[in-house]
């Protein structure tokens, strides 16, 4: 599982001209799922993101989590995080999970964020063409990847 985490002042997602998800201060998550992701990967990632200390404290140090600052999360599915453009000029998406698996995993991940966390969680629409708007705060952007079985 790969998640691109962006600290934002605000973010929103629009589908067919309608805003379907919107947050103020918090985290925009672009969420990618691969074939081998398990429930353990989803839970690990949800816990990591909820506790990730990338918001500044009173001394300007990254010492607070999204929960600590009363922020929110906007989670958007993004299969292109598994794009491989090492060969040729058109990316291959063979490492991305099939849509059925990816949708179920994405939905389970969002449920875990809501269950394990204490912050509002908004979402995009799976497999839709989305217009995602954000105002980066920092900018602070991190790419997280769940540990491989060897790393666990």
Swiss-Prot record:
Gene3D superfamilies, sorted: D-tyrosyl-tRNA(Tyr) deacylase (3.50.80.10)
Disulfide bonds: none
InterPro entries, sorted: Daa-tRNA_deacyls_DTD, DTD-like_sf
UniProt KW Calcium keyword: no
Record field: catalytic activity: glycyl-tRNA(Ala) + H2O = tRNA(Ala) + glycine + H(+); a D-aminoacyl-tRNA + H2O = a tRNA + a D-alpha-amino acid + H(+)
Keywords of this entry: Cytoplasm, Hydrolase, RNA-binding, tRNA-binding
Job description of the protein: An aminoacyl-tRNA editing enzyme that deacylates mischarged D-aminoacyl-tRNAs. Also deacylates mischarged glycyl-tRNA(Ala), protecting cells against glycine mischarging by AlaRS. Acts via tRNA-based rather than protein-based catalysis; rejects L-amino acids rather than detecting D-amino acids in the active site. By recycling D-aminoacyl-tRNA to D-amino acids and free tRNA molecules, this enzyme counteracts the toxicity associated with the formation of D-aminoacyl-tRNA entities in vivo and helps enforce protein L-homochirality.
Protein name: D-aminoacyl-tRNA deacylase
